[in-house]
């Protein structure tokens, strides 16, 4: 701790002596370098930066309590109320170092409890030294930002915690009013936070004590590098920084060197594992009958909560319309929807008023969607990690779950790559071709209607018996 504090003091003195601009130029170069190449190696080069490294196995049983980690009684009591019975591996290893004042690099997958791993130390520090604009958490997506805010609010409920979510797609003026109320914690996407730093009168982060970058690998993959650079330039150099990421790529390594001081690196090993209570299946089907097989699977699992993953926004919308035309409660989730519609879709799915979510990979990481019974991969993802993240939406918190991959003749190479990474072959889903093809005529009609609607053709008289139902469901999408 003394070493980290000494380095922070040196940084603060540089700011006072006017040499901050040189450091900021160095930061700018470091961060902007992270976005130069799309073909960088997945694993980082050896860094000259020294840090303490802790490796922990995800399957390792935890015997410590939150109190054993040094967490204060009031937060421990809140953890009990939230049913956080024992710390997860990432929490058990990172929280004690964070409470000592160390910067943290946390390498862990979604569902590992990493949000609480950085929220608890921030809240404990805030409890001991309450002041506004204490912490900023940066997230790559709007949905994840709201999820993080909910976790902070739950853990900080006994403290009267004030939070503000600042993301794109929402009203700037409303957000400016929320910022003027001096929240303790701001959860933001980088681009919108920069908008407020540059345009919202009276708003600054000069008193900031904590910066958290969650899912840093995605922040950089989504080319937030220039925005991160601007943020790092205007916040105090004497602060605590937590960087959490699913992978330690070379881009993340550069970001770590530019923004952290003497960090502790806590890595939770997963080895491309899926949950033991997850049943994984595949269905080989000709591409032209893919929709028919999908509808058969949905029919066989009617009443269950399911997420169907598609590769493109267009397919997400089309499949949603197709299923709704057939009477299923399906809602889409993709980047072309307004923020209100996206939150409305998530709320309806979480509450159970709609039980089928058709999503692009925006929903495969970071979102806490409980009690999903089935994941269907309509399109095979292009890499094994995405597959792990997708099927990880089910079989959570000890529950059983099931996943099915639809594999056409065009997906074989990708599918075999995933089997190789998993180290096992997936079982074939039990079905009878005759039973599947009984759906083909109805599916073809519903599909034509969906495509016609997406093209915006009028054809009111020619179009189908599905029109009234479509209009009703369209209104449902945007509801909160």
Swiss-Prot record:
PROSITE patterns: DEAD_ATP_HELICASE, HELICASE_ATP_BIND_1, HELICASE_CTER, Q_MOTIF
Catalysis: reaction(s): ATP + H2O = ADP + phosphate + H(+)
Region (Disordered): 1-63, 450-480
Name of the featured protein: ATP-dependent rRNA helicase RRP3
Entry GO CC: nucleus
Chain ranges for the short sequence motif Q motif as given in the UniProt record: 64-92
Record localization: Nucleus
Recorded GO MF terms: ATP binding; ATP hydrolysis activity; RNA binding; RNA helicase activity
Chain intervals with Basic residues compositional bias: 462-471
Organism domain of life: Eukaryota
Record-annotated Helicase ATP-binding domain positions: 95-266
Its biological purpose: ATP-dependent rRNA helicase required for pre-ribosomal RNA processing. Involved in the maturation of the 35S-pre-rRNA and to its cleavage to mature 18S rRNA.
UniProt record, GO biological process: rRNA processing
Motif (DEAD box): 214-217
Keyword annotations of the record: ATP-binding, Helicase, Hydrolase, Nucleotide-binding, Nucleus, Ribosome biogenesis, RNA-binding, rRNA processing
InterPro entries: DDX47/Rrp3_DEADc, DEAD/DEAH_box_helicase_dom, DEAD_box_RNA_helicase, Helicase_ATP-bd, Helicase_C-like, P-loop_NTPase, RNA-helicase_DEAD-box_CS, RNA_helicase_DEAD_Q_motif
Phylogenetic placement of the source organism: Eukaryota, Fungi, Dikarya, Ascomycota, Saccharomycotina
Record's comment describing the protein's domains: The Q motif is unique to and characteristic of the DEAD box family of RNA helicases and controls ATP binding and hydrolysis.
Family per similarity comment: Belongs to the DEAD box helicase family. DDX47/RRP3 subfamily.
Alphabetical list of SMART domains matching this protein: DEXDc, HELICc
Positions bound to ATP: 108-115
């Amino acid at each position: 701790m003394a070493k980290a504090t000494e380095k922070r003091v040196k940084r603060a003195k540089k700011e006072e002596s006017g040499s901050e601009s040189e450091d900021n130029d160095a930061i700018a170069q470091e961060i902007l370098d992270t976005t130069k190449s799309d073909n960088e190696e997945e694993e980082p080069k050896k860094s000259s930066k020294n840090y303490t490294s802790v490796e922990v196995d995800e399957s390792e049983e935890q015997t410590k309590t939150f109190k054993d980690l040094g967490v204060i009684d009031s937060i421990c009591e809140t953890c009990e109320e939230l049913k956080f019975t024992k710390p997860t591996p990432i929490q058990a290893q990172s929280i004690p170092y964070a409470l000592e004042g160390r910067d943290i690099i946390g390498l862990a997958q979604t569902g590992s409890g990493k949000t609480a791993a950085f929220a608890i130390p921030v809240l404990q520090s805030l409890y001991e030294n309450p002041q506004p604009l204490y912490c900023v958490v940066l997230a790559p997506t709007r949905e994840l930002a709201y999820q993080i805010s909910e976790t902070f609010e739950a853990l900080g409920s006994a403290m009267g915690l004030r939070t503000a979510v600042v993301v794109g797609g929402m009203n700037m003026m409303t957000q400016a009013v929320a910022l003027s109320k001096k929240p303790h914690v701001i959860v933001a996407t980088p681009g919108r936070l920069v908008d407020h730093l540059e345009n919202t009168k009276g708003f600054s982060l000069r008193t900031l004590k904590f910066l958290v970058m969650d899912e840093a690998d995605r922040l950089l993959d989504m080319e937030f590098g220039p925005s991160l650079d601007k943020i790092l330039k205007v916040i105090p150099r004497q602060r605590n920084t937590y960087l959490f990421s699913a992978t330690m790529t070379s881009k993340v390594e550069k970001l770590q060197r530019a923004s952290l001081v003497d960090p502790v690196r806590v890595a939770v090993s997963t080895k491309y594992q899926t949950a033991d209570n997850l049943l994984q299946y595949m269905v080989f089907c000709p591409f032209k009958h893919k929709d028919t097989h999908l509808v058969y699977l949905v029919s066989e699992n009617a009443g269950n909560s399911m997420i169907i993953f598609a590769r493109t926004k267009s397919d997400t919308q089309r499949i949603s319309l197709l299923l709704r035309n057939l009477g299923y409660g399906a809602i889409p989730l993709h980047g072309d929807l307004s923020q209100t519609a996206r939150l409305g879709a998530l709320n309806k799915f979480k509450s159970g008023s709609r039980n089928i979510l058709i999503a692009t990979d925006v929903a495969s990481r970071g979102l806490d969607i409980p009690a999903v019974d089935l994941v269907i991969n309509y399109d095979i993802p292009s890499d094994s990690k995405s597959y792990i993240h997708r099927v990880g939406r089910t079989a959570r918190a000890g529950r059983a779950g099931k996943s099915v991959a639809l594999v056409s003749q065009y997906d074989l190479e990708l599918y075999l790559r995933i089997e190789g990474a998993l180290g096992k072959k997936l079982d074939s889903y039990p079905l009878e071709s005759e039973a599947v093809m009984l759906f083909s005529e109805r599916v073809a009609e519903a599909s034509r209607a969906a495509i016609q609607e997406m093209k915006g053709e009028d054809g009111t008289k020619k179009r189908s018996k599905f029109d009234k139902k479509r209009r009703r469901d369209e209104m449902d999408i945007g509801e909160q």
